[in-house]
Amino acid sequence: MRQSSTLTWTSVLLAPLAASKGLIADYASCQSACVSLSSQLSVESVGNYIAEFEQQPIAGAGVEAGSLYWSQQQQALRPACLVHAREAQDVALVVQTSRSTGCPFAVRGGGHSDIPGFSNSHGGITVNMAGLGDVKVDASAGVARIGAGAKWGAVFKELDKTNKTVVGGRLTGVGVGGLLLGGGLSHLSGLHGLACDNVRNYEIVLANGSIFDVSHSTHPDLYRALRGGGNNFGVVTRFDLDLYDQGPMWGGLHVWPLLPSVTSAITSAFAEFGHEAPSDKHVSLFAGLGFMQGNFAWAVGQYDTLGREEPPIFSKFRDDAETYGAPKLVKTARVTSLSDLAEELNLSEPAGMRSRFTTATFRMDVDLLQLMAGYFVEEVERALENGLREDKRFAPMLGIQPLTKNILRAQSKRGGNVMGLDEESGPLIVCSFGWEWFRETDDAVVIAGIKSVLEKSVAAAKEKGLYHPFKYMNYAAEDQDPIASYGAENVEFLKKVRHTYDSDGLFMKLVPGGHKI
């Protein structure tokens, strides 16, 4: 009775706020849903989210040490109740309760999306999957069974003990579920493709509350749809991933100051790598032009899964004062574990900030990369002049990552994914325009700056015949439609699969977060 009273109080307190924002169609349905859940799950499984939220620090060194959600925009939302799922049956009960009451819900895996409502429900039910975070290694079967509530840091720490790994994320604080359902760029993608292409089996809760194991052999249509189709078909509670041998890796960050000579050298080396990468599948690379603590700088991440220091394919990124015109400011490259490399990258994205990402894809071209760098600097300087100079935590970034032919070729395994890319499309540049700031009052300035960089870059690419319609789901903004970018044939396939497994459209209507079909 006490727990039910607490949940009722939370819903009543929330009702005026939710109604004013138009985010709840019927708050009474969610009050009913929360009371019903509290009577069927243990007291520990349903929490007073407002009380729990107040106990969380707003800003920390990273997601693990800070808030429930990585971005302020998600953390600010208030669900009617928070369900702490411990097993797939708990998730099934939430789905059934949502269906019977009409109360919307959201699923929090790692909580790393910056888009409000993607993994937190304002006025509805939020399912916290952290209790479904087990990592079980079956070396004899060549598979790692990973709960959907795990984060990649915990996954890699467990796998490091076995000298095995999986194709997964690159930051410790990113959740397993979101990354795998949206694609997943990895240090191992050159060898094995995107992370989603290395899922052997999904345990999923469907719209009717049933729990199924889905693989290429059991449900080939749903299996393919889940490889890039997002959260449109059910709630995945476990991912069974292909297991690979992995010893110590070489890798780290290389940082230069922003100079015309540095921009020229890095963009040229990046484009050359994009074309040459198929000759060495054991390496991976990304680059970014950023602004932090008053300075612009280029950062390049270089990685080798064999542990080779400075492999030849990275020769153009070595210190060369004549080419770069400046020495490196930072070099962290070393031979270490995959979990250590993931922790290093996680430190670059502290929790508790406001954040916005958007994305675009272009064909590999040096001149376009240099134009984009110019657009980025121009818009950041404009934002600084319009109040962001006062925000010492303002950290915009233009990120570029190669989708090489070998990565694209590996997508075809087990029937392929739904993203509409093939080897002949490459090499491509996947861009992430990701800006972080602290004050809500600066939202308009920041969003205008991001939009301008994106629009100018797209316009330049189209003029040069370098534009590609693909939008990578894991970097896409709320107002972008990555699924439409997969092409008409794949969209029709996804609609058919959705109708087969969710004919009433529960995951379209009652799970408003996520990119929809």
Curated annotation (Swiss-Prot):
Residues listed as glycosylation sites in the UniProt record: N163, N208, N346
Q: Which cofactor does it need?
A: FAD
Keyword Oxidoreductase applies: yes
**Signal peptide range in chain numbering:** 1-19
Query: Where in this protein does the record say Pros-8alpha-FAD histidine is found?
Result: H112
Give every FAD-binding PCMH-type domain span: 75-246
- Pathway in which this enzyme or protein is active: Secondary metabolite biosynthesis; terpenoid biosynthesis
Observed effect of gene inactivation = Leads to complete loss of terpestacin and fusaproliferin production and accumulates oxo-preterpestacin I.
Superkingdom of the organism of origin? Eukaryota
Q: What GO molecular functions are on record for this protein?
A: FAD binding; oxidoreductase activity
Entry annotated with the keyword Glycoprotein: yes
Which EC number(s) does UniProt give?
1.-.-.-
Q: Which Pfam families match?
A: FAD_binding_4
> How do people use this protein in biotech?
Fusaproliferin shows cytotoxicity against pancreatic cancer cell lines and provides a new chemical scaffold that can be further developed to obtain more potent synthetic agents against pancreatic cancer. Fusaproliferin and its analogs show also anti-inflammatory activity and can be hit compounds for the treatment of inflammation-associated diseases.
**Main role?**
FAD-dependent monooxygenase; part of the gene cluster that mediates the biosynthesis of the mycotoxin fusaproliferin (FUP) that belongs to the class of bicyclic sesterterpenoids. The product of FUP1, preterpestacin I, might also serve as a substrate of FUP4 to yield oxo-preterpestacin I.
Could you say which protein family the record assigns here?
Belongs to the oxygen-dependent FAD-linked oxidoreductase family.
Q: Which PANTHER family match?
A: BINDING OXIDOREDUCTASE, PUTATIVE (AFU_ORTHOLOGUE AFUA_1G17690)-RELATED (PTHR42973), FAD-BINDING PCMH-TYPE DOMAIN-CONTAINING PROTEIN (PTHR42973:SF13)
The protein depicted here goes by the name FAD-dependent monooxygenase FUP4
Query: From which organism does this entry originate?
Result: Fusarium proliferatum (strain ET1) (Orchid endophyte fungus)
Which gene underlies this protein? FUP4
